[in-house]
Amino acid sequence: MGDVVETEDFKITFVSAGEYKSDNEYITPKKGYEYWKFKFKFENTSDTDQNVSTMMDWECYADNSKADQQWIGDDSGLDATLSAGRQTEGTVYFEVPKDSKHIELEYDINYWQDNKIVFVGK
């Protein structure tokens, strides 16, 4: 946590990661799983508008197995079209096995190319 990565268009700060427990009784992980919350800050360092997506740009792996992304509905997503110099902060959530030893989150820098940043949550 606290890592900063600079891409062609963004300065990305990995703010935090950890288990997430909802106060809503209807938002619960399936048996043997828990929710993980990853918080990021994105700053547009380019000269043009750039999009950030909560649901489209991320993949999570727990012990090298793909984890399901979850929509918690707390209005803290990263979705934004950022003008040059603007920033946003938000979270993405995934459902991972409770006994996971390693949790990694991949951010797809460019949909058309195979460029990814890997953030280690655990």
Spell out what each predicted region is.
Residues 1-122:
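Conserved functional micro-motifs across diverse proteins
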